[in-house]
Amino acid sequence: MKVTLDEVAARAGVSLATVSRVLGRRGAVAESTRAKVLEAMSELGYSRSTLLHDAPRRLVAVSAPGNPEHWQVQVCTRVAKALQDHDLLVTRPLVETDPEPLQTAIEAGAVALVTTTMTSLNTEIPCIRVAEQSATEEVSEAGTEVIAARLDLGGGMTTAFEHLRAIGHRRIGLICNDSGELAVQLIRRFLAEHPARNLGLNLEDWISRVPKSFSGGSRAVLELKDATCTAVIVQSALQLHGALHGLRNRHLQVPRDMSVVGFGDSPTMKFTGPPATVLGLDVEGLSNALIDATLQTLRISTTGLPSVPPVFRPRLVARTSTTAARQ
């Protein structure tokens, strides 16, 4: 004979609405009440095809920001695989652009967020992420942020500037996103490390904040060319591809008329025409730092978090999109 929800409610001594909330996992139900409902279901032999038992494995959100860079996707993929190898369930909601996917993951039981964004997200679950080396972190109200690794953007900028200065460039511009913590930190380090910072020039004129898009890069590089820049550092891959296209459309050549340095390497950078000089990131090192911090935060590993997170300095990968400045 088929067991009904009314019978379950009667056996547990609760309302039908309470039984529905327990089955649908909606709304607040006291743990003791939930236990009584589950016990009544077991005693009566109630079951249905959509009734899922609690998974013994924990759920972790591994997230890149919306419209991510190649290095961010690579790191997230490595982290997700490693966590699955440790018998954790993984979901991949995007963060920053839309809070709903992450909130859905949290409501589904995610116990931690691992992300390659540098923006503080103020989540109600532990957020394991990357930060800029010299950034002052604002601790979230719940105290849930774990900085697993730091990027030495200042050192990366210095490396790019040293490379460009060595081949005669002084008027160096920056193309960056018009929003986001990474753009903020890149601008700050650009102004602090620029070789012309003590010459009384307005370096803001050599910064172009544009959307993270192909068209944004095309527009920005021509604006900086008109501002007499001879070289540019570009934040995103889309902007870099757009910058190369914009220069070609004006019948200018890279690197003869403009040297270009990208931020973050990817397989396509070898085929950008000319192959792009970039500041490459240690994908393996960043991945391992995030994996270790996650396992320690979830107490799967007992080695403990390092007192100082590891620091990763971008390294220059010199190709043919940079050359000596024209005299």
Model-derived features: where do they sit?
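Periplasmic-binding protein-like
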Residues: 61, 106-117, 171-176, 207, ...
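Hydrophobic alpha-helical segments within soluble ligand-binding/sensing domains
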Residues: 134-137, 142-174, 184, 214-222, ...
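Short beta-strand elements in bilobed, periplasmic/extracellular small-molecule ligand-binding domains
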Residues: 83-95, 173-174, 189, 193-215
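An alpha-beta-alpha
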Residues: 158-199, 304-322
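Short beta-strand segments enriched in small/hydrophobic residues
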Residues: 18-20, 52-68, 171-178
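Flexible loop/turn connectors
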Residues: 223-327
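N-terminal helix-turn-helix DNA-binding module of bacterial transcription factors
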Residues: 1-56, 326
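Alpha-helical recognition/docking segments in bacterial nutrient-uptake
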Residues: 57-162
